[in-house]
Amino acid sequence: MTAALTVRVAEDADLPALDRGLPTGRNDAHRAFLARQAAGEVTYLVAWRGDAPVGVGVVRWTGRGGSPYPELSNLHVPPPVQSQGIGTAIVHFAEDVARSRGRAGLAIGVDEDNVRAAALYERLGYVDTGRRWTGSYTWYDESGAEHAETEHVRVLTLKLG
C-alpha cells in the first residue's frame, strides 16, 4: 500500500530528508529556500509520501514578470514520481497558502518549452497573461557538473476565490 500524499510548509528539521530524497548538488537549494523562508521572502512547500519528500515548490511573495500576484516557482517533481498528482497537490496547497494571506490570485511562471507543465496549469484553470520574462541561472547535477540555463518564461495566473 502506498503512503498518503501530504503537502506542507517546509521546516528546518526537514533539511536532511530533503537533501537525501531530492538532492540539489552544490546548489544547496533546500537550505537557501529555508533561509529565504525565515526572512519572509518565500514559503517553501514540500510534498511527502510517508516520510519521503516527493516534490517541492516555492511561493515567492513578490511576483516576477509584472504579476501583481505572488508566484509559485521552482515546482519540481522527479520523473519517477511524475503523473501521480504530486504537482497538482503542490499547486493547490500554494493556492491555499496565498488565500490564507489574503491574496487575490496566484501566478505561475512556466518555461515556454515546458509544454507538459503548462498543460497541467491550464487544466487547473490558470490563464496565460501574455506577460513574458527571461531568466538565467546555474545549477549543478548530482555529479557536480555545472549547467548554465536560460528560461523564456510565460506567466499564467489564477484568480483565487
Q: PLM ranges: what are they?
A:
Residues 42, 149-156:
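Short hydrophobic/aromatic beta-strand or adjacent loop that forms the aromatic wall/cage
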Residues 56-69, 134-149:
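Conserved acyl-donor/pantetheine-binding loop and adjacent beta-alpha core of acyl/acetyltransferases
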Residues 3-5, 9-80, 91-93, 97, ...:
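Acetyl-CoA-dependent GNAT
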Residues 77, 90-94, 106, 121, ...:
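Hydrophobic packing within well-folded, soluble alpha/beta domains
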Residues 78-80, 84, 112-113:
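Active-site acidic-Proline motif in GNAT/NAT acetyltransferases
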Residues 109-110, 122, 127-147, 154:
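Conserved catalytic-core motifs of GNAT/GCN5-like acyltransferases
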Residues 87, 91, 113-117, 133-140:
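Short glycine/proline-centered loop/turn elements that form peptide/ligand docking sites
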Residues 98-109:
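Conserved GNAT acetyl-CoA-binding A-motif
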